[in-house]
Amino acid sequence: MIQQESRLRVADNTGAKEILCIRVLGGSSRRYAGIGDVIVATVKDAIPGGNVKRGDVVKAVVVRTVKERRRPDGSYIKFDENAAVLIKADNDPRGTRIFGPVGRELRDKKFMKIVSLAPEVL
């Protein structure tokens, strides 16, 4: 469950290491984002020479959350950290690699490129 001011780890190789959520997209009064939801964020920590630098405003899709999520079959999925992948305007990932597992909900929300790059889909 990601809300404004939440900090997330970046799970790709764009050069950003940590982002801070500015806004959850999908309605004027939407408060929380889960796996597969798009957020607007700012880069809080980045490595030198990366594609993005500190202070950049970016769009990202949430791929892992600590808050458990109930699936239609009754099972629950949760992760050890909150993580996101930076995306372009056309919802393709900005990086060329994805680190760590991602939730199956990304496939339902049509983020197929991220699913194909991920080493594991849970």
From Swiss-Prot:
<keyword id="KW-0687">Ribonucleoprotein</keyword>
<comment type="subunit">
    <text>Part of the 50S ribosomal subunit. Forms a cluster with proteins L3 and L19. In the 70S ribosome, L14 and L19 interact and together make contacts with the 16S rRNA in bridges B5 and B8.</text>
</comment>
<comment type="function">
    <text>Binds to 23S rRNA. Forms part of two intersubunit bridges in the 70S ribosome.</text>
</comment>
<keyword id="KW-0689">Ribosomal protein</keyword>
<dbReference type="Pfam" id="PF00238">
    <property type="entry name" value="Ribosomal_L14"/>
</dbReference>
<comment type="similarity">
    <text>Belongs to the universal ribosomal protein uL14 family.</text>
</comment>
<dbReference type="GO" id="GO:0070180">
    <property type="term" value="F:large ribosomal subunit rRNA binding"/>
</dbReference>
<keyword id="KW-0694">RNA-binding</keyword>
<dbReference type="InterPro" id="IPR036853">
    <property type="entry name" value="Ribosomal_uL14_sf"/>
</dbReference>
<dbReference type="GO" id="GO:0003735">
    <property type="term" value="F:structural constituent of ribosome"/>
</dbReference>
<keyword id="KW-0699">rRNA-binding</keyword>
<dbReference type="InterPro" id="IPR005745">
    <property type="entry name" value="Ribosomal_uL14_bac-type"/>
</dbReference>
<protein>
    <recommendedName>
        <fullName>Large ribosomal subunit protein uL14</fullName>
    </recommendedName>
</protein>
<dbReference type="GO" id="GO:0006412">
    <property type="term" value="P:translation"/>
</dbReference>
<dbReference type="InterPro" id="IPR019972">
    <property type="entry name" value="Ribosomal_uL14_CS"/>
</dbReference>
<dbReference type="GO" id="GO:0022625">
    <property type="term" value="C:cytosolic large ribosomal subunit"/>
</dbReference>
<dbReference type="InterPro" id="IPR000218">
    <property type="entry name" value="Ribosomal_uL14"/>
</dbReference>
